[in-house]
């Protein structure tokens, strides 16, 4: 690859060297100026480049693409690069994917006609070649002397804007917007207070009511009836031990529950069997009952209404005594029948 590039470059630059000799030999006695020499060299370069391009095109037509495979390149791309020159010329470079490129130069400047006109472009080219040197020294000298430097128009954007150019309406609008924001914040805070205070009051009231309802529910569950308390409570007599107290309490609670049933059975029997007994037999029975039964205990219950009289309720022992007496009477009356 390097060998091919050397051959191509030698074909490009050798015609330029050959073309320079006849120009100097044609006019040996005449000395050309620098500008005329420059333009003559450029023309010779263009002629040599055109000859080289024709040679390259002929070589492309003759040479095969690849001797080993025998296949030709189908996707060959061509790239063109153009670069402008300071003196007004343009350099365009064309390159392809098969490593073959060519250099072209296009010139826009025209040759001068008079000697006076020849000097002017040379001076202008010299001035334009170094345009920043005098400006740099002037700026540096002014900076050392602490003098104000007149900058370009673009630098004016970095200067501060005078206060007169600013609009006073912007400040008014900003102040109005700040006032509106403050009013909105105050309104929102007041609304939150107005909503939160009633909610707190309602919550405290509901909690207080729930507490009272809970207390009432406990009282209703464990309510005390004085009548039941007097019936269930047992008063032991003197000289009774703890064991007898517990047994008597059990028996008392048992007889309290069954006293009502006994009374109902007694009334039914009295209605179904009317009997006539003599006075002697009744007396004997009563004497026998008084001999082995304990004294009766009577209890008084207060009436629920003021118009009613006091109700005397017999104890469970009296009811048992009456039942036993009734049974004895039935036994005595059965043989007589």
Curated annotation (Swiss-Prot):
Lumenal compartment residues: 21-183
Description of post-translational modifications: Highly N- and O-glycosylated; contains sialic acid. MN9 epitope is O-glycosylated.
Distribution of this protein across tissues and organs: Sperm specific, including germ cells (at protein level).
Consequence recorded when altering residue 138 to A: MN9 antibody detectability is lost
Lyase is among the record's keywords: no
Cellular component per GO, a single term: early endosome
Name of the protein this chain belongs to: Equatorin
Gene: Eqtn
């Amino acid at each position: 690859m390097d060998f091919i590039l050397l051959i191509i470059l030698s074909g490009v630059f050798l015609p330029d060297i050959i073309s320079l000799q006849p120009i100097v030999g044609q006019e040996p006695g005449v000395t050309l100026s620098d500008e005329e020499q420059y333009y003559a060299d450029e023309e010779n370069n263009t002629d040599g480049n055109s000859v080289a391009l024709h040679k390259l095109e002929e070589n492309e037509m003759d040479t095969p693409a690849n001797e080993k495979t025998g296949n030709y390149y189908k996707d060959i791309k061509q790239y063109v690069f153009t670069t402008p020159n300071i003196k007004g010329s343009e350099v365009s470079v064309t390159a392809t994917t098969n490593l073959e490129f060519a250099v072209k130069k296009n010139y826009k400047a025209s040759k001068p006609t008079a000697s006076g006109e020849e000097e002017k472009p040379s001076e202008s080219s010299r001035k334009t070649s170094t345009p920043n040197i005098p400006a740099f020294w002037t700026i540096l000298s002014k900076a050392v002397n602490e003098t104000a430097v007149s900058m370009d128009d673009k630098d004016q954007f970095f200067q501060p804007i005078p206060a007169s150019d600013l609009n006073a309406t912007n400040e008014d609008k900003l102040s109005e917007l700040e006032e509106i924001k403050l009013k909105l914040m105050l309104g929102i805070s007041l609304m939150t207070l107005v909503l939160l205070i009633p909610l707190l009051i309602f919550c405290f009231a509901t909690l207080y009511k729930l507490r009272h309802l809970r207390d009432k529910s406990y009282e209703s569950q464990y309510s005390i009836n004085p009548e039941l308390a007097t019936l269930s409570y047992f008063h032991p007599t003197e000289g009774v031990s703890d064991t007898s107290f517990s047994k008597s309490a059990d028996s008392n609670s048992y007889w309290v529950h069954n006293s009502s049933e006994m009374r109902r059975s007694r009334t039914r029997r009295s209605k179904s069997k009317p009997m006539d007994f003599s006075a002697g037999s009744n007396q004997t029975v009563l004497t026998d009952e008084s001999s082995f039964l304990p004294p009766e205990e009577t209890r008084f219950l207060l009436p629920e209404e003021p118009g009613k009289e006091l109700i005397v309720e017999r104890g469970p022992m009296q009811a048992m005594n009456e039942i036993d007496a009734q049974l004895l009477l039935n036994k005595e009356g059965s043989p007589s029948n």
